[in-house]
């Protein structure tokens, strides 16, 4: 898959401080942004952190501040974001206009460093990265309260975050 090869290059270049996204970048996109606000599932299928299970949620995701212990640094995510903007073929190449987001959020035990779980989610539009953040929090709160299972929350947000609250019955 080209995204992973390009991502590997982006990581190496980013670590060396050599990558930049600009309007002059002329590369063909490999991922589609036609389904926005959802990512292209062939490029961003989502991934789970195997260290988070239903049986340990009260010592992982339900602990305040836990996501900070697993969140990758921007030195890791910024090169991925830069390459993802190219891969998704976004016309706006300003990195500040995107969040390098986890499709399956860390709040629900998403894989922190899996490139297939990260994508440049726009801050613009009717359903944005900020909108998804609210969905993530509501799902995590429902999981921690025992209203829904971790598996149900993960599946719903991975399949379509815009309908996840309705699908799980908490929206």
PLM feature spans:
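Nuclease and nuclease-like effector domains acting on nucleic acids or nucleotide cofactors
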Residues: 2-98, 107-171
């Amino acid at each position: 898959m080209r995204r992973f090869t390009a991502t590997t290059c982006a990581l190496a270049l980013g670590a060396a401080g050599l990558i930049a996204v600009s309007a002059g970048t002329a590369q063909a996109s490999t991922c589609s942004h036609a389904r926005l606000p959802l990512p292209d599932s062939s490029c961003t299928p989502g991934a789970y952190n195997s260290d988070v299970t239903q049986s340990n949620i009260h010592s992982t995701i339900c602990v305040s501040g836990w996501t900070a212990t697993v969140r990758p640094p921007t030195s890791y995510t910024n090169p991925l974001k830069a390459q993802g903007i190219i891969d998704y073929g976004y016309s706006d190449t300003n990195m500040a206009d995107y969040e390098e987001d986890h499709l399956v959020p860390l709040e629900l035990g998403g894989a922190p460093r899996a490139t297939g779980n990260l994508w440049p989610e726009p801050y613009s539009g009717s359903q944005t990265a900020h909108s998804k953040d609210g969905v993530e929090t509501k799902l995590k709160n429902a999981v921690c309260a025992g209203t829904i299972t971790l598996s149900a929350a993960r599946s719903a947000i991975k399949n379509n975050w815009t309908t996840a609250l309705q699908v799980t019955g908490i929206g």
